[in-house]
Amino acid sequence: MSHKLVLVLNCGSSSLKFAVIDALTGDDQISGLAECFGLEDSRIKWKVNGQKSEASLGAFTAHREAVEYIVNDILGAHPEIAAEIQAIGHRVVHGGEKFTRSVIIDESVIHGIEDCATLAPLHNPAHLIGIRAAQASFPALPQVAVFDTAFHQTMPEKAYIYALPYKLYRENAIRRYGMHGTSHLFISREAAAALGKDEADTNIICAHLGNGASVTAIKGGKSVDTSMGLTPLEGLVMGTRCGDLDPSVIFHLVNRLGYTLDEVESVLNKQSGLLGISELTNDCRGIEEGFGSGHKGATLALEIFCYRLAKYIASYTVPLERLDAVVFTGGIGENSDLIREKVLNSLAIFNFNVDKERNAAARFGNGGQITTDEGTVAMVIPTNEEWVIAQDAIELIK
């Protein structure tokens, strides 16, 4: 069988996820993570055909050294895989309004990603470092950028414009952009197939739930509304992010309580959400354990998380007009039968009837319908953003 292999790179501020994916099947040939960049113990872990390995990258190394290690040591040890790589696919968090679809990277694309860096200051600069490193290591291979924001560029103006002076949008592009677009796109395609429908005739609400979380209304395969905004801070309760908030809270923290703006930003992004409410952990597994043992903070955090999510799902029936299914994905969405059941029970008005056996079975990579055959469909579909990136890369280089 012929392969169409793509090296997928996902560069964070202090880490780099990588995988060699077969765009035809979605199978990983190689997958791994380099982390702790800039520290004394930078390391890289990887897996080839199920066999795990680990190595030190050396002190204070970063993206370039990680890419070089991937090329020289990992791929160098597997020339049969390296020889079949046809493109490099890069995940890019923010493409602003400039990038409405995946693109082959050239200098103009790099400048465009740089221009969007103020909208994703932790992510876009890291992506650019990864792109430059990959260009140096793979000068003969085409490089493709796949944007988290691109899928949401089909939202109508009434969904993405904030009720601020319009010139802030016109002159500064302040608007809702949304994130997790690659995941929501994958789920849109997979949900239509699972329902036996054409994607253009499928309306779903997708809940991507992880440490970062977002909900998207998808009508006929296109995003029509999403919960994250200008940045990933808006919307749902998340691991450490507050989600929706009265903006005057910021003024109160600064003017009355003496916080600096940097401190406020840290509170809203890194100290809030499940962690802030529970005063215990940002990890949903720990929250569920606390809920089970009667921990007051964990119980409150879980209740608020589920309540906010249920409200968003209910509100996103408005732009859809008809709902074919609610789909849960992401680390929490794929594994927490407790949260799924609590959320769907709150949406009984929409005729969701949770099948406890199906719901309990949909964990650890197992998906499928979690409601009874009577009533509205809810299902679990494990996401695969890397596969979408690989598919887009191969499609663009045809």
Curated annotation (Swiss-Prot):
The protein's required cofactor(s) are namely: Mg(2+); Mn(2+)
Q: Which residues bind substrate?
A: R91
Its annotated pathway reads: Metabolic intermediate biosynthesis; acetyl-CoA biosynthesis; acetyl-CoA from acetate: step 1/2
The Swiss-Prot or TrEMBL record annotates one GO molecular function as: ATP binding
Q: Which domain of life is it from?
A: Bacteria
Query: Active site annotated at which positions?
Result: D148 (proton donor/acceptor)
> What does the Swiss-Prot or TrEMBL cofactor note state?
Mg(2+). Can also accept Mn(2+).
Q: Which PROSITE patterns match?
A: ACETATE_KINASE_1, ACETATE_KINASE_2
Q: Which reaction does it catalyse?
A: acetate + ATP = acetyl phosphate + ADP
Tell me which residues bind ATP: K17, H208, L209, G210, N211, G212, D283, C284, R285, G331, I332, G333, E334, N335
Q: What family name appears in the similarity comment?
A: Belongs to the acetokinase family.
- Which HAMAP family does this chain map to? Acetate_kinase
**Job description of the protein:** Catalyzes the formation of acetyl phosphate from acetate and ATP. Can also catalyze the reverse reaction.
What quaternary structure, including any partners, is listed in this protein's UniProt entry? Homodimer.
Protein name (record): Acetate kinase
Protein source organism: Shewanella pealeana (strain ATCC 700345 / ANG-SQ1)
